[in-house]
């Protein structure tokens, strides 16, 4: 924490997040690597590949919930159990919709994500959305443009 022990974990980090709790795990998305998704143990300094086979194919956004890493690319959201390698699709952009996912965040019993409409027909879809972790009941929460989302208590903040 004093900056005296800097260490390069990877060449290129697209996204990262720290696991809640005492496990001290960091998840890294490394676009320059063949494996892309890693878990890094801050205590042992051990880096391990997390399998995301069968899930989002181009991870850009990640967040933790227990043993699950929630992963999003431009058009899909999936979750991977970093201990077992189990991977499950949660949600994907409906066919024919010109929108991109802009972030993903798990809070309580919902997965929150930003959508950005890339053409005039999809502009109404721009905003903060949520979905159940099993992929059901997706709904729009706000029309705010979302680059990042986080929660403090029960209040959300977007940038």
Report the location of each language-model feature:
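Short loop/turn segments that connect beta-strands within beta-propeller blades
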Residues: 1-4, 41-45, 81-85, 132-136
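Disulfide-stabilized cysteine-rich extracellular repeat microdomains
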Residues: 4, 14, 52-55, 95, ...
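Residue position within the beta-strands of beta-propeller blades
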Residues: 26-30, 70-71, 112-115, 157-159
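Eukaryotic tandem repeat interaction scaffolds
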Residues: 35, 42, 51-82, 87-105, ...
């Amino acid at each position: 924490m004093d900056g005296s022990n800097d260490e390069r974990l990877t060449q290129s980090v697209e996204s990262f997040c720290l696991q809640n709790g005492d496990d001290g795990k960091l998840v890294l998305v490394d676009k320059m690597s063949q494996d892309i998704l890693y878990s890094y143990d801050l205590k042992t300094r051990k880096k391990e590949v997390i399998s995301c086979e069968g899930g989002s194919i181009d991870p850009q956004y990640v967040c933790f919930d227990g043993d699950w890493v929630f992963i999003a690319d431009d058009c899909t959201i999936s979750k991977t159990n970093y201990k077992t390698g189990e991977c499950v699709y949660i949600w994907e952009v409906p066919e024919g919709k010109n929108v991109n996912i802009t972030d993903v965040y798990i809070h309580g019993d919902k997965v929150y994500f930003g959508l950005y409409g890339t053409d005039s027909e999809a502009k109404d879809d721009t905003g903060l959305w949520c979905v159940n972790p099993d992929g059901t009941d997706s709904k729009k929460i706000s029309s705010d443009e979302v680059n990042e989302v986080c929660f403090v208590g029960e209040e959300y903040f977007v940038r």
